[in-house]
Amino acid sequence: MIQPQSRLKVADNTGAKEVMCIRVLGGSNRKFANIGDIIVCSVKDATPGGVVKKGDVVKAVIVRTRKGIRREDGTYIRFDDNAAVLIREDKTPRGTRIFGPVARELRDKDFMKIVSLAPEVL
């Protein structure tokens, strides 16, 4: 469950290391985001020479949360950290690599490029 002011790790190679959620997209008064939701973020920590730099405002899709998500068969999937992947306006990832596992729910939400780049889909 991600809300404004939440900090997330960045699970791609765009150069950003940490982002802070500043808005949850998908409704005028939406308060929380979960796996597969798009958020607007500010880059808080970045490596030199990356695609993005500190202070940039970017869009990202959440790929892992500590809260987890309930599946149709009644099982829950939870992760060790909160992580996001930076995306462009057309929902394609800005980076060329994805680090760490991602949830299978991204496939249902049309983030096929992220699912195909991920080393593990849980």
Curated annotation (Swiss-Prot):
Subunit structure: Part of the 50S ribosomal subunit. Forms a cluster with proteins L3 and L19. In the 70S ribosome, L14 and L19 interact and together make contacts with the 16S rRNA in bridges B5 and B8.
The protein's name in its UniProt record: Large ribosomal subunit protein uL14
A single GO cellular-component term on record: cytosolic large ribosomal subunit
Family matches, as PROSITE patterns: RIBOSOMAL_L14
Pfam families noted in UniProt: Ribosomal_L14
Species of origin: Caldicellulosiruptor saccharolyticus (strain ATCC 43494 / DSM 8903 / Tp8T 6331)
UniProt cross-references to HAMAP family, sorted A to Z: Ribosomal_uL14
Keywords for this protein: Ribonucleoprotein, Ribosomal protein, RNA-binding, rRNA-binding
SMART domains: Ribosomal_L14
GO biological process, one term: translation
Family to which this protein belongs: Belongs to the universal ribosomal protein uL14 family.
Source domain of life: Bacteria
Function description: Binds to 23S rRNA. Forms part of two intersubunit bridges in the 70S ribosome.
GO molecular-function terms, A-Z: large ribosomal subunit rRNA binding; structural constituent of ribosome
